Structures are given as structure tokens and as C-alpha cells.
Amino acid sequence: MSGFGWNQQSGPIAPVLIYPAAGVLLMGLCITFVVETIMGGINTGLNNALTGMGNSSKVILGLVLGGMMAIDMGGPFNKAAYVFGTAAIAAGNNDRMAAVMVGGMTPPCAIALASLLFKDKFTKEEREAGPTNFIMGLAFITEGAIPFAASDPVHVLPSCIVGSAAAGAISMFFNCTLMAPHGGIFVFPVVGNAMMYLVALVVGTLISAILLGVLKKKVA
């Protein structure tokens, strides 16, 4: 009887209290013991690989860091590169952070430029939103490119990755440095070799914008 009574009483509250609480608990356990373990291992592996790469070729490291910033634009690869860059600042390797930031600035700037140069490759809504990405890119907000990448990942992501990788490699080649972990153009006064850093951003942006114009299909 007590079991029956409990079922009758819990019936109305189960959908609004018990089920959500159980779902949150299960999700928390899954994230803690499965997702965090897997992602922690991946991040550790990436960090070790990047550290080892830094001992062999700075330009290749810059290329990889820049490309990682555009692979998922705010996802695990992007964040792994960013964390590596910020940790490098503490270690006195300011050139790593410079490559990371210029790689993250490139995708939004490239999409903004491409939406102006190749209007037939973007929808009306994308053309209207495109110029806003100049501001986001210059402020080092890579996520501004996400809607464009989500709508056409096959063509947008490779274009952005190539340009970001080129920007990161150029930054490292000219020994550009950055002591700030964020800020975009607002921290250019503390960038070492700022002129070539700007060149890296412009070249990376042009490469990605041109690739977007070539690879993207015309909007019907």
C-alpha cells in the first residue's frame, strides 16, 4: 500500500522534479567521469605535441597554432591552442600567443571581406551580417564566424583554417610577440614587431577570403 501511495503522490511531481533532477545527476556524472577524462587526455596530448613542436620549428608551430584556432572556432582545438598560448606567456614565450591571436582574428575578418567581395556567394542575411565580423575579428572574437561555418562547413572551415595557419606561420617567422592574452587590435601597442604582425593578419585574411570566393557555391 505504501508503495502504491508513493506512486500516486509522486506521479504529479515526477515530470517537474524527479526526472529533471535525475537527468542533471546522470549528466553531471557522465561529464565528470567520461567527457572530462576524454577531453583532458586529448588536451594533454595536444599540449605535449605543441610543446615538442616548439623545440623543432617555430614556423610550423605557428602554422599549427593558427590553424587550430580556426578548426572549431571556440571548441576544444581552439581552446587548447589558446590555453597553450596563455601558458607560454607565463613561460616567457610570447611569440606563441601572438600566433594564437592572429590565427583567431583571421576567420571573422576573412568572412567579412569575402561577403563584400563575393556577394553572390552569400545570402542576403549573411551579407548584412558580414561586415560585423570585421569588428569581431579585430577584437579577437573568433566565434563571430561560427554561423557562417555552420551553414557551409565543407567550404568555410578549410578556407579559414588555411588563412589562419598562414597568419600564425608568418607571425612566428617574423618573431612577432604578444604579452597580452586577449584584446585584438586594442593590444597592438604591446605587440612586438607590430608592422609584420599586421601583415600576417592581412595576408591570412586575404588568403581565406579568396578561398571562400573560390570554394563557396553561388547562392541560388
Give the ranges of each region predicted by the language model.
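Pore-lining transmembrane helices
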Residues: M1-V219
